[in-house]
C-alpha cells in the first residue's frame, strides 16, 4: 500500500511540475501549395499530353506554369496521371 501511495503522490507532483513550465510555440507558416496531382485516368497520354493536362486541370482561379502527363500501368491496364505545377521551381 505504501508503494501505491508513493506512486500516486509522485504522479500528482509530476503533473504539477510539468504544468508549471509552459513553452510557447510559434505557429508555423503554411507552405503554399506548389503541385497539383490529378487522378489516374484510363488510357495513355495523348500526343499533346502537357496541353491536355493543362486543359483538364485548368481552373479560373489557378494558373499553372507547367503540366506533365505521366503514363502508369496498373492492373495490366494503361493509365495516365496529370501533374501540374503552380510555381517553378517546386521544392517540396
Curated annotation (Swiss-Prot):
Assigned GO CC terms: extracellular region
Signal peptide: 1-27
Keywords assigned: Antimicrobial, Disulfide bond, Fungicide, Plant defense, Secreted, Signal
One Gene Ontology biological process: killing of cells of another organism
Cystine pairings recorded for this chain: 34-90, 45-69, 53-82, 67-84
Compartments where found: Secreted
Keyword Signal applies: yes
Family membership noted in the UniProt record: Belongs to the DEFL family.
Protein's recorded name: Putative defensin-like protein 251
Gene name, Swiss-Prot/TrEMBL: SCRL12
Amino acid at each position: 500500500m505504501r508503494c501505491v501511495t508513493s506512486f500516486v503522490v509522485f504522479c500528482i507532483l509530476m503533473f504539477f511540475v510539468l504544468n508549471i513550465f509552459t513553452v510557447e510555440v510559434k505557429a508555423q507558416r503554411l507552405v503554399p501549395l506548389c503541385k497539383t496531382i490529378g487522378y489516374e485516368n484510363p488510357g495513355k497520354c495523348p500526343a499533346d499530353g502537357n496541353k491536355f493536362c493543362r486543359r483538364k486541370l485548368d481552373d479560373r482561379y489557378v494558373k499553372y506554369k507547367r503540366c506533365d502527363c505521366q503514363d502508369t500501368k496498373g492492373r495490366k491496364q494503361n493509365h495516365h496521371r496529370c501533374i501540374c505545377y503552380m510555381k517553378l521551381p517546386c521544392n517540396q
